[in-house]
From Swiss-Prot:
Disulfide topology: C148-C227, C348-C352
Binding residue positions for serotonin: D155, N342
Membrane topology (Cytoplasmic): 98-111, 172-191, 259-321, 382-470
Pfam families xref list: 7tm_1 (PF00001)
Keyword Transmembrane on entry: yes
Major site of localization recorded for this protein: membrane
Activity regulation information from UniProt: G-protein coupled receptor activity is regulated by lipids: oleamide increases HTR2A-mediated activity.
Name the UniProt record assigns to this protein: 5-hydroxytryptamine receptor 2A
Organism of provenance: Sus scrofa
Extracellular-side segments: 1-80, 138-146, 216-232, 348-355
Role according to the record: G-protein coupled receptor for 5-hydroxytryptamine (serotonin). Also functions as a receptor for various drugs and psychoactive substances, including mescaline, psilocybin, 1-(2,5-dimethoxy-4-iodophenyl)-2-aminopropane (DOI) and lysergic acid diethylamide (LSD). Ligand binding causes a conformation change that triggers signaling via guanine nucleotide-binding proteins (G proteins) and modulates the activity of downstream effectors.
Bias-annotated ranges (Polar residues): 458-470
Length: 470
């Protein structure tokens, strides 16, 4: 933008020139706020009465002029996108740290979640800031044209990697439920990393045609000065291969996993009832010895502990599926509008309004980006280990505080002493009760003898039986 001030004989002082320029600025603001401003003549005003000021802008629809004209409108959207970027980067860094440092979280599913967090973090570092820059420049590409294809490639790569990770997690958990022995045998850390490498390889292969053809032909990635996929074949094939097909696999395997868990829980409950019935059935007489009673009680306890362990494992699986289900649901809800609108833009090119479709795509793509920032919040709300780890990392405490040996002894020894004293008291009470029972038995024996002496001879057998029973 050029500001050309022509001095006149009546405008010799710098103060007057500044005041005149300020008047012209107020004139511009008044016209802009009244809604009469136009992008074609916003910077071509000339005050002809005194020939004081001439504001001109070459190419009024160029990015700098367009950005300056709509600066007041774009501030809020830029602020919101900046918040999304910060949340995405910070939250996913916390997830990566938690899986790397917490031993409780080091399993196959959390390794996939860590790789997913890496993809989301790179999306926040490399893709979202450039997208925010295009918003400030009126959705025009402000960088060198060769970087446009690279930026679209990274966008498609990280978005495809996200859906592929979720699809792989769903498949892995379904295999673990259906064939647990085989899954445990092939579920080492190395095998998990090999699966993650396979996911990234597939994502790179799907998105690689974009830079290959985009760098050769700018028309495939540019449309009216905006950096976007302009080839209809890229849009259709990419939408189905990178989103809809993995989405279908993910949803089907997730619901099959839920169904299998419900079936296992039902079988476990019925099996637990059968074991309890078999254990409660006793072949021993009621007047058995105390050791035999203890043996019977130990048999009765075994199925309960077995059932509790099995039900606990099923409950843990159900909780994990619940958290993953929320992640899947949010990802689908946030990305589906963009991909559906993307396909509509190709199918109904003639009947649909391109301006409306373009505006919807600009909004829906940021809703999809928001899913990368939401995942750490889901882990925080529904997983205690993640929540405690995040709170410690925010306070710069990277290791869990363990109690010193002295505190452990202070906390455990009094409890043990209390339990031992209670045990001794119980033993004393039991011994007193035994002594009383013995005294009663002895008195009964004495009474029996006395009664036998005074009683007739025909009752002697009955008395002797009573004494022997005691």
């Amino acid at each position: 933008m050029d500001v050309l001030c022509e001095e006149n004989t009546s405008l010799s002082s710098p103060t007057n020139s500044f005041m005149q320029l300020n008047d012209d600025t107020r004139l511009y603001h008044n016209d802009f706020n009244s809604g009469e401003a136009n992008t074609s003549d916003a910077f071509n005003w000339t005050v002809d009465s005194e020939n004081r000021t001439n504001l001109s802008c070459e190419g009024c629809l160029s990015p700098p002029c367009f950005s300056l004209l709509h600066l007041q409108e774009k501030n809020w959207s830029a602020l919101l996108t900046a918040v999304v970027i910060i949340l995405t980067i910070a939250g996913n860094i916390l997830v990566i740290m938690a899986v790397s440092l917490e031993k409780k979280l080091q399993n196959a599913t959390n390794y996939f979640l860590m790789s997913l967090a890496i993809a989301d973090m790179l999306l926040g570092f490399l893709v979202m800031p450039v997208s925010m820059l295009t918003i400030l420049y009126g959705y025009r590409w402000p960088l060198p044209s060769k970087l446009c294809a690279v930026w679209i490639y990274l966008d498609v790569l990280f978005s495809t990697a996200s859906i592929m990770h979720l699809c792989a997690i769903s498949l892995d958990r379904y295999v673990a439920i259906q064939n647990p022995i085989h899954h445990r045998r092939f579920n080492s850390r190395t095998k998990a990393f090999l699966k993650i490498i396979a996911v990234w390889t597939i994502s790179v292969g799907i998105s690689m045609p974009i830079p290959v053809f985009g760098l050769q032909d700018d028309s495939k990635v540019f449309k009216e000065g905006s950096c976007l996929l302009a080839d209809d074949n890229f849009v259709l094939i990419g939408s189905f291969v990178s989103f809809f097909i993995p989405l279908t696999i993910m949803v089907i395997t997730y619901f099959l996993t839920i169904k299998s868990l419900q079936k296992e829980a039902t079988l476990c409950v019925s099996d637990l009832g059968t074991r309890a019935k078999l254990a409660s059935f006793s072949f021993l007489p009621q007047s058995s010895l105390s050791s035999e009673k203890l043996f019977q009680r130990s048999i009765h306890r075994e199925p309960g502990s077995y059932g509790r362990r099995t039900m606990q494992s099923i409950s843990n699986e159900q909780k994990a599926c619940k958290v993953l289900g929320i992640v899947f649901f949010l990802f689908v809800v946030m990305w589906c509008p963009f991909f559906i609108t993307n396909i509509m833009a190709v199918i109904c090119k003639e009947s649909c309004n391109e301006d409306v479709i373009g505006a919807l795509l600009n909004v829906f793509v940021w809703i999809g980006y928001l899913s990368s920032a939401v995942n750490p919040l889901v882990y925080t709300l529904f997983n205690k280990t993640y929540r405690s780890a995040f709170s410690r990392y925010i306070q710069c405490q990277y290791k869990e505080n363990k109690k010193p040996l002295q505190l452990i002894l202070v906390n455990t020894i009094p409890a043990l002493a209390y339990k031992s004293s209670q045990l001794q008291t119980g033993q004393k009470e039991n011994s007193k009760q035994d002594d009383k029972a013995t005294e009663n038995d002895c008195t009964m024996v004495a009474l029996g003898k006395q009664h036998s002496e005074d009683a007739p001879a025909d009752n002697s057998n009955t008395v002797n039986e009573k004494v022997s029973c005691v």
